Amino acid sequence: MSELKDCPLQFHDFKSVDHIKLCPRYTAVLSRSEDDGIGIEELDTLQLELETLLSSASRRLRVLEAETQILTDWQDKKGDRRFLKLGKEHELGTPIKHSKPKKQKLDGKVSHASGPGPGRPKSRNMQQKMQEYEFTDDPVDVPRIPKNDAPNRFWASVEPYCADITNDEIKVLEDLLKTPEDEADYYKIPPLGKHYSQRWAQEDLLEEQKDGARAALSGDKKKGILGPLAELDSKDVDSLLKKSDSQHDQPEDGCPFGHLTQRLLQALVEENIISPVEDSPIPEISGKESGTDGASTSPRSQNKPFSAPHTKSLEVRVKEELIAQGLLESDDRPADDSEDEVLAELRKRQAELKALSAHNRAKKQELLRLAKEEMNRQELRQRVRMADNEVMDAFRKIMAARQKKRTPTKKEKDQAWKALKERESILKLLDG
């Protein structure tokens, strides 16, 4: 009985997992037939319930392994203690005549008490018990539970966001607030290039010029035919294109002036200045004059369109003058600009970029302000920790004085009060 009392085993009461209550899906799947199978939507629930069963089994396994190790260690210590006692008796050389009466006395007192005296029979009993508690190694290795490293990885990923703000991070924010040098380039509108029809025409002329130069080298006849075209250069091509544009770009009404110039002249001309046809006398034209006039005016000269120099510059000057006088708004653009889809889209995206950059700049300024405030709070928290250490030091000194049954000195009391007041003032600053 004494051996059972000294046994360090705890004999845990293992509670079995209630499958019906804790693992209802697992129980339902076991009760089905093989033909029913398992649905895809049930896999997540089954995984959780199987993990619950695995954790319960691993917990029981760990407890049993701990109990086995405790039992083995206890038997080893007990055997070593008894073998040491036997060795000491043999070294002392106890005579046999003294041991026999003791053995007889022990045999006579077996019914009354069983003392734990040293001897051969006890060692045999100990060996038998050791054989009883020997555990054979299971050939099947128990699978090791994988280490759950998810919390460590989670906190390692969160730590940079919860760490204290440093001066380097403040410097990074200040650098981000600086205006980049190339910011103005994003708001520039590139000049309008040549129209694709003009560019293609120029490319066609240049290509014909190259073809003519190649053909001129082949023979004199071809050189005589294509020579003038082959001698053209890029400047001649541009002049030809401008000439063709000036001939074909005449308005439908034949007037070379722009819309603003025409509207201005229409506003200045007085209406109803032509008298009726009946009242106006018809002048008589002599035959000589009519002959000369008839000879001078030909159908070809009548069909020739009217042209005036510097009409485009006149249109621009009229527009500038009307804007300066306040008769025309400066935002009014010509019809070509208003119909330019690329320019409209470019202006739209530039406006969005301005709004977005302004929003980002405001957020960065707010973030910089909050970071500087947090830096000040970090310094206050550091001072609070130092004040806490001072308060704890003063408290230890006072407690040590009371343990020695002496009253704390005035210096110790003043130091404690000073530390407490300083801590309160720092906390007020931190809360404020």
From Swiss-Prot:
MF-aspect GO terms: transcription coactivator activity
Region (Disordered): 90-127, 275-314
Cellular component per GO, a single term: nucleus
Keyword presence, DNA-binding: no
Cell compartments where the protein resides: Nucleus
Sections of the chain in a coiled coil: 335-398
Name used for this protein in its record: Transcriptional adapter 3-A
Gene source species: Xenopus laevis
Gene: tada3-a
